[in-house]
Regions:
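Polar low-complexity intrinsically disordered regions
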Residues: 1-5, 69-72
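Negatively charged, low-complexity tracts enriched in Asp/Glu with abundant Ser/Thr
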Residues: 2-26
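Charged/polar, solvent-exposed surface patches and flexible loops
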Residues: 12, 16, 20, 65, ...
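Acidic, low-complexity, intrinsically disordered interaction modules
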Residues: 25-84
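Short acidic DE-rich linear segments
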Residues: 89-92
Length: 92
C-alpha cells in the first residue's frame, strides 16, 4: 500500500541524485537519471548512471530535464522531481 510518504521519499532520492550530479558534473559521462523499483526491498530508487540507454517509460530521464537555472546557478527542478515520483508511485 503506497502512501504520500513513499512519494516524498522518492522525490528526495531523485533530488539527492541530481544534486550529487550538480556537485560533480565532470564525474559523469552522458549522465542520466535512472528510477527503478528495487525488488529485493520493494523500495523505489533513483541514481545517476552513465551511458544508459532508454526512455522515460524505462525509468531513464535526461539529466538536463531535472535541472533549472536558479538565482545562484543550476539547481534541481523540484517540480520535475515531484512529477517523476508521482508517475512511479500511486496512492491506494
Amino acid at each position: 500500500m503506497a502512501s504520500i510518504q513513499d512519494i516524498q521519499a522518492l522525490e528526495e532520492r531523485i533530488y539527492d541524485a541530481v544534486q550529487e550530479y550538480l556537485d560533480n558534473p565532470d564525474g559523469y559521462e552522458n549522465a542520466v537519471l535512472r528510477v527503478y523499483l528495487d525488488e529485493d526491498d520493494m523500495i523505489h530508487r533513483a541514481e545517476i548512471d552513465n551511458n544508459l540507454q532508454g526512455t522515460e517509460d524505462d525509468g531513464i530521464y535526461a539529466i538536463e530535464s531535472l535541472i533549472r537555472e536558479g538565482d545562484d546557478g543550476p539547481e534541481v527542478d523540484n517540480d520535475r522531481a515531484s512529477d517523476i515520483a508521482n508517475s512511479w508511485i500511486f496512492l491506494d
